[in-house]
Regions:
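Short, well-ordered beta-to-alpha junction loops that form the rim of enzyme active sites
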Residues: 78, 121, 157
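Substrate-binding and catalytic surfaces of secreted/luminal carbohydrate-active proteins
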Residues: 73, 99, 103, 108, ...
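Flexible loop residues that form catalytic
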Residues: 29, 121, 185
């Protein structure tokens, strides 16, 4: 309804004369409240074609890419459609949801995803699923661009880097994960630092709060450790 204001906001956040944000996360959605709203599911039924126009996220990603084509895109999820969780083969069903959503994002908006978050937001880490997703993307042939180039983020845990310890004990898992992300933490433990320094893993503070929003979990990463 207000395209000029909308574009002005996007220019301020992502434009060359603005804040120059470089990354955008888009939720796949499952028609449930995910703490800040309800994002529509891209696939409500197993036999329907994925529809990325139901919510605003993918359209927003496309508009951001018009302003700055170098912005990287990450796809993640807080919950999944019931047909996925009720499936006799949850991993295959979940991958179908991922894959068809990736396909639809490209077909509808020309979006190429740089990252996908494997784990459900702030839930128990499913290492077998992370490995399954990595193998499936790397071997996918029926795709509009090279899905093997999509990097996997794990595990969006809250206040811990537990995934790092699991990775150090499991080479296949370690190889599957490109980015280690944690929420609401002001530190990285020695194992996580080793994975970054010796194994080349990216480390992300992948969710946090600004001081004026929720000061208890907001951190200023300065030399004084002012927190």
């Amino acid at each position: 309804k207000n395209p000029e204001s909308y574009n002005k906001i996007l220019e301020h956040l992502y434009g060359k004369n603005g804040l120059k944000f470089t990354h955008f996360k888009v939720e796949m959605g499952a028609d449930v409240n995910t703490s800040s709203g309800t994002e529509p599911a891209t696939m409500r039924y197993e036999d329907e074609k994925a529809d990325v126009t139901r919510g605003a996220g993918f359209q927003l990603a496309a508009d951001i890419k018009k302003i700055n084509p170098d912005v990287t895109l990450d796809m993640l999820w807080w919950s999944e459609p019931k047909w996925v969780s009720d499936s006799s083969d949850v991993y295959a069903a979940r991958y179908k949801w991922y894959k068809q959503t990736l396909d639809a994002a490209y077909e509808t908006y020309g979006l190429v995803l740089d990252y996908v978050s494997a784990n459900q937001n702030e839930r128990a880490v499913d290492t077998d699923w992370i490995k399954y997703l990595s193998k499936a993307l790397k071997s996918e042939k029926d795709c509009p661009y090279d899905y093997s180039e999509i990097k996997i983020v794990a595990a969006d845990e809250c206040g811990t880097w537990g995934i790092s310890r699991l990775m150090m004990k499991n080479k296949e898992l370690c190889d599957a994960v490109d980015v280690i992300g944690s929420h609401y933490t002001s530190f990285a433990d020695d194992t996580t630092k080793k994975l970054a320094e010796e194994y080349g893993k990216e480390l992300w503070f992948s969710e946090g709060s600004s001081p004026m929003n929720y000061a208890q979990s907001a951190y200023r990463f300065d030399e004084g450790n002012s927190g």
